């Protein structure tokens, strides 16, 4: 991985010239520590010192507790709409410990992105980028593995935040209407390499390579001990999990760029339709399914998209209590679940099929069926609104040209993907009507079907009907994954509830609909009733 240096950028922190410098480094450090400590609330000061000590000692239990519980609590209480203490203040408390300061700044800039009204300033975005570069250079460029222990949830959120800040910066960079000429010059010329797509891909691929995660996943699927191919770096959980999470975020990056084939391709070592030993972070598993399902939908593999969305939505229903204690994670997962219900509704309209009854029940309770009926009737505006709500926030890999007109280019990638999607929808918007007529008959003359669609039909309309029926056949025949580690593999299958062939001027129709299987539904209800009955019996009145 290429190294980057942030020396030319200042941190724009507060500087003070009233220190009583003695010339003795130890005394000066002690003075600065006491000076800055006096400016902080006591619980913040002790939290930072204990946090640093836990990182030094590699105490995973304490690190995870402070990261997941204490840090958010202090943020809510002291820094709800303001930033955490500056680097200089914290450095004086922890003796400028290099590793801890990089980790602290990662949390510091993440907090600014999430909490500060108006978002981060340009210099904060740049400084955050170079802090990530410092972290990745530290762990990737080292000749030997860095002995650093961090909980998996932090590693996932660190890598995912890295990609989020790239996405956020790309949108910020594309919005020229609220920037001065000097800011545009800095963004598009002076700092054109900051948060560049090449850097993001370089980092993620470097983490994948150094961890040998692909070889490890292939070994696991082949029943081989992954430690035989892991190498010195990959045998450590720290590097192994960073490599796995980088694969997932490569999926996200390629989806944001609209390269759906590559998005699925990069996950090939991961059997995405099977539960993995690495999928114990709910947010990671949900994010994976969201982007995989969306990529399948855009590739017109609706059956695979429906299966992906249905499986993960069932998982969310079962495991909601695992993340409900973390409000920010709960909000994020609920939003992504809502987006997936919208995408699932689109896929079911374009490719009707049976899904789990509990998912159907949610679609009914949240009134998705009304919108689905409108989409089936060809209402393109509903398709458009569902897509805009549920799709990722696409970005352009390149900044606007330095001499580009002063316009807002943020929506350009979104509008392009929307156009691609709507072109496909327009090709299919008449198919539900055709399907509804075919379902009523076992044999039907072409001329009669043409008259149903248009009472004033003539011979030309019958010829056009043949084109429509051919389109129906084509659109209902999808590539469907069946087995293997590659999500791109599959066999062509007809996903329609009916099939037909034409002999002379007669349509012969066969209903291939699979009847609902209610056994699983009743078993779940019985188990739920028994569980409720046990709880009632245990209540002491």
Swiss-Prot record:
Keyword Protein biosynthesis recorded: yes
GO terms assigned for molecular function: translation initiation factor activity
Domain PCI residues, every copy: 308-516
GO biological process: formation of cytoplasmic translation initiation complex
GO cellular component, one term: eukaryotic 43S preinitiation complex
Subcellular location: Cytoplasm
InterPro entries: eIF3l (IPR019382), PCI_dom (IPR000717), TPR-like_helical_dom_sf (IPR011990)
Protein keywords: Cytoplasm, Initiation factor, Protein biosynthesis
Function: Component of the eukaryotic translation initiation factor 3 (eIF-3) complex, which is involved in protein synthesis of a specialized repertoire of mRNAs and, together with other initiation factors, stimulates binding of mRNA and methionyl-tRNAi to the 40S ribosome. The eIF-3 complex specifically targets and initiates translation of a subset of mRNAs involved in cell proliferation.
PANTHER family tied to this protein: EUKARYOTIC TRANSLATION INITIATION FACTOR 3, EUKARYOTIC TRANSLATION INITIATION FACTOR 3 SUBUNIT L
Family under the similarity heading: Belongs to the eIF-3 subunit L family.
Subunit structure: Component of the eukaryotic translation initiation factor 3 (eIF-3) complex. The eIF-3 complex interacts with pix.
Entry protein name: Eukaryotic translation initiation factor 3 subunit L
Organism: Drosophila persimilis (Fruit fly)
